[in-house]
Amino acid sequence: MTDTRRRVKVYTLNEDRQWDDRGTGHVSSGYVERLKGMSLLVRAESDGSLLLESKINPNTAYQKQQDTLIVWSEAENYDLALSFQEKAGCDEIWEKICQVQGKDPSVDITQDLVDESEEERFDDMSSPGLELPSCELSRLEEIAELVASSLPSPLRREKLALALENEGYIKKLLELFHVCEDLENIEGLHHLYEIIKGIFLLNRTALFEVMFSEECIMDVIGCLEYDPALSQPRKHREFLTKTAKFKEVIPISDPELKQKIHQTYRVQYIQDMVLPTPSVFEENMLSTLHSFIFFNKVEIVGMLQEDEKFLTDLFAQLTDEATDEEKRQELVNFLKEFCAFSQTLQPQNRDAFFKTLSNMGILPALEVILGMDDTQVRSAATDIFSYLVEYNPSMVREFVMQEAQQNDDVSKKLTEQKITSKDILLINLIIEHMICDTDPELGGAVQLMGLLRTLVDPENMLATANKTEKTEFLGFFYKHCMHVLTAPLLANTTEDKPSKDDFQTAQLLALVLELLTFCVEHHTYHIKNYIINKDILRRVLVLMASKHAFLALCALRFKRKIIGLKDEFYNRYIMKSFLFEPVVKAFLNNGSRYNLMNSAIIEMFEFIRVEDIKSLTAHVIENYWKALEDVDYVQTFKGLKLRFEQQRERQDNPKLDSMRSILRNHRYRRDARTLEDEEEMWFNTDEDDMEDGEAVVSPSDKTKNDDDIMDPISKFMERKKLKESEEKEVLLKTNLSGRQSPSFKLSLSSGTKTNLTSQSSTTNLPGSPGSPGSPGSPGSPGSVPKNTSQTAAITTKGGLVGLVDYPDDDEDDDEDEDKEDTLPLSKKAKFDS
């Protein structure tokens, strides 16, 4: 049999009961050996690949809808649809399906939609079709009961639907509706409401086509006004005829398109406003209604796209200066609805839609509209712009860069136009609208900031062999736009505190800082050059003095993001300008309050300590230690001081660092098990042995026991043990009885170096009140044994701690030592033997 090729779109129904477009191709029917039967084949028109191969199963229920649709279920919860470009192609494939199943092609459905039970199947064989009562006023109650009783059974629903179709019953019911309204027969109107609602739940396309026809749809809506659960009927028809006016902003010449728009609006209104909220059971019975609306929308968008005269007139009138304001507002609102309409389409359809709008010049038109004074028009234009950015940010970037290039070319010829040409850049208009938002809650500014963030996000920028969109666009953005974005920040931070500190200004600056923080994270050298050259961080930190905590935290978050990069260019800039001073001032001014500001500042310094950022550690201790040394409810600042002293010690004794490297390299060359064994033996050595300078190594490495290497290592380990004792003593200083409220004074003088290795300092440190076994307790006079000190440290960590407290992990190498000291005796004995 020869194939009949017809152009179709293939759809599948997803979990949300929405149709997904699987592609466009040509359908044919033929025998497929692998499937052992006649099948439907769809090959993609782009590359000829197979989009669909479906055997025409004799028991599958196929439905023909709206003359150009064939819908069926391949398996449970897997629905398919073919949408034909031409009715003739649909008819030919439908005839082929009916031929395989032995059905009359005049039917719209080939099988029952749901498998009925054996009992129902027997009843079907033994009983004739459903007989409807005569359509009379006196029998409305009987009809309503019949419809209600048929809904639970798939077989009875099918019989009822066939009876309603064959007898033209719906139109007769609508005639009775007029009679009931004229007679004010409320009981009859209530019965009609139940009947029409039940017909919707039959989920039958053929019935919908009758109900949604021009002559019937308003009467159907009228029946649904008389809900028995309501004391007064709804006035849906009055709203649709008097309030909801169809404005033809651009004349539509195609009467079929106009009728389709009217029908879709009304059916959507029925679904959203008229029908009661369906139950889960009823929701599944309204899938055909969803499909009806979906395919109508696809058709409308397609017909409008193909009408080039319509779109040309639309954009011409939008940008024409002679167009009056009311007309322009209507045009913009239409375009906004048109774009919103497209969001229901599948990706392929949306691509074609926005490509058409782009070719028609939507972005230049939006630029003109955004420059107008009418706030409503600008708001609608912003919504349209958001659709474009979400759909294809690269398209928007390409436009604004081309625009900037054109302006630069003009400015070379006419220097006086340089400022004007920069001011009219589309992206600068967006930034200005964000900055000038008059809404107290800045709803529009938040939306625009999100769009700008999408545009400057490198994650969605394209990269090709010849050029990189990221490099080109970011170069453009920092040259032409960044000064506009930072203008309100720079204007408000000329002094030591914000010149304007009202709530709306604070909200706006918080938005600007949020975008700048995003840039710090994603833009590397572009934002780095801008921050350092324009001294942006110093201006941002002025906002730490704001009375609005959320703005001060935004400023702190900006600096924290910069420090988190661990970039020495940034670090040198921070140190050169003494940019920790505003942070320390804010910390001291916050006093003894436990709040987010306190925690965030401590976390910043803790990050510097844990990551061992040497330059910042030295800068903080040398310049701010006097102001921070009394903070003892966390160990962060004392830990920073310890880091600083260790750095000094390494600088004073370079051999110490080299010995540590030798030791580490010597150990890392061996496998992990050997390393672990040797660590146990090393750290289980008696202190007396260490004092004598003897090292314990595994027999396998005795040949490597060079006196020139191991003698300095032994000295290093002695010094290391003294430091560990010192650190444990520092831990014991944590106050377990609650947080202190020391008085602070900011001092920028350098702190004096403390000798951390002196024996006297380790034995005279005060202990924590209430800590068992601490140096000051009666049970531990004089020096502290190793196990006692360790117990005290563990108790301190397990007790009550401050809001922000961190484990003291200055030396990564000490972790293994702590573990080894707690080994059971049996394990130690294994290595001592």
From Swiss-Prot:
One of its GO terms (cellular component) is cytosol. Its main location: cytoplasm. Disulfide bonds: none annotated. GO terms for biological process: DNA damage response; gluconeogenesis; positive regulation of gluconeogenesis; regulation of double-strand break repair. InterPro entries: ARM-type_fold, EVH1_PP4R3, P4R3-like_central_dom, PH-like_dom_sf, PP4R3-like. Residues 1-100 form the WH1 domain. The modification Phosphoserine is found at residues 117, 127, 698, 741, 768, 771, 774, 777, 780. Belongs to the SMEK family. This is Serine/threonine-protein phosphatase 4 regulatory subunit 3A. It comes from Homo sapiens (Human).
